A protein has these predicted regions:
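Interdomain/boundary linker segments immediately adjacent to catalytic/signaling cores
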Residues: 1-25
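Conserved beta3 VAIK motif of the Hanks protein kinase fold
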Residues: 79
Length: 151
């Protein structure tokens, strides 16, 4: 991740934290999503919400999935939101990875506005390098290859 992308990813995480600080726990995923879009609008960052991704099986259309928030220019990133009582799971990571591959984006982030009394906001930054997925630690810069292919 280059220095500009790193700076922008950190700014994005600060937006997630601001939303968590103001709204607290007990909201739906949609409410958190709407609040994030307010943060993006205030900064003039272009995005789309609920962008559809068609799914094909053996050349036949079988359905679609929806990408929560997609940033296109400021930082090409897919944002997948959760509001659950559990930690971010590998299937959440693989969900955003499939979206990243579809969009041909190198950056993704899964954000969980954790509803558990003992947990707060959690997030995982995902990078694709040579189509291999990694979890990126913003604080240390460490890359950990995601090898749990159980999804």
């Amino acid at each position: 991740m280059d220095i500009t992308d790193l700076h922008r990813m950190n700014e994005l995480v600060e937006m997630f934290k601001e939303v968590a600080s103001v709204l607290k726990k007990g909201r739906t995923e949609t409410v958190y999503q709407n609040a994030i879009t307010v943060e993006l609008q205030e900064r003039g960052i272009q995005y789309t919400e609920e962008e559809t991704m068609p799914i094909y099986y053996k050349g036949k259309y079988v359905g679609q999935e929806r990408l929560d928030i997609v940033l296109h220019t400021w930082l090409q990133v897919i944002i997948e939101l959760k509001a659950t009582t559990t930690d971010i799971k590998s299937d959440n990571l693989w969900q955003v990875i499939s979206y990243m591959r579809y969009k041909k984006y190198k950056h993704g982030v899964v954000v969980n506005y954790n509803q558990s009394p003992s947990k707060d906001l959690t997030y995982s930054v995902v990078l694709l390098q040579d189509d291999l997925p990694y979890i990126y630690d913003l604080e240390t810069g460490a890359l950990t290859e995601l090898t749990d292919y159980s999804y």
